[in-house]
């Protein structure tokens, strides 16, 4: 019993079966933007990266299905208030892993960064979770720590990454 924040939709989810753990930069996108040249060890490090709390994040299964392997030039989170953080995180992961961006991807990222209130900080502050069990609302701050990655379903499995063909 608990709550998980689904960043792409800006909602709290209480049913864990409606969540997916998503590679922020999808495996196919990473492959196409330079991951194809990685050793199997580097690929394994990428798809199991728990050193960055934004690399693998909890999202609603519907948002994850909608995003698929698309980059920001083809898909944006439904919650536009998350666009600044989304672009900042996307860029951070691409830079950290030495991945490239297309010109269309760069244009989309620049547009999304244009929604920032100031320079991106790299820190996303979760909105307060509210619940009403009586006539009064209670507010709590929630931090999500994920250590076990569930099966991503029948779309692409992490083990498929090493077999991607350009």
Listing of model-derived features with the role each one plays in the protein:
Residues 130-148:
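Extracellular mucin-like PTS domains
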Residues 144-165:
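Extracytoplasmic/periplasm-facing segments of secreted or lipoprotein envelope proteins
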Residues 1:
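Active-site acidic/histidine clusters and adjacent loop/turn architecture
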Residues 4-130:
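Domain-level detector of nuclease and nuclease-like folds
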């Amino acid at each position: 019993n608990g709550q998980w924040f689904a960043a792409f939709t800006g909602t709290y989810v209480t049913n864990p079966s409606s969540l997916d753990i998503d590679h922020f930069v999808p495996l196919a996108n990473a492959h196409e933007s330079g991951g194809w040249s990685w050793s199997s060890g580097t690929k394994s490090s990428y798809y199991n990266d728990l050193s960055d709390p934004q690399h693998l994040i909890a999202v609603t299964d519907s948002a994850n299905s909608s995003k698929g392997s698309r980059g920001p030039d083809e898909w944006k989170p439904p919650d536009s208030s998350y666009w600044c953080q989304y672009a900042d995180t996307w860029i951070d992961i691409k830079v950290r892993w030495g991945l490239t961006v297309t010109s269309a991807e760069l244009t989309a990222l620049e547009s999304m960064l244009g929604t920032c209130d100031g320079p991106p900080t790299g820190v996303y502050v979760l909105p307060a979770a509210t619940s009403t069990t009586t006539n009064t609302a209670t507010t709590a701050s929630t931090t999500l720590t994920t250590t076990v990655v569930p099966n991503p379903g029948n779309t692409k499995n992490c083990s498929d990454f090493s077999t991607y063909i350009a």
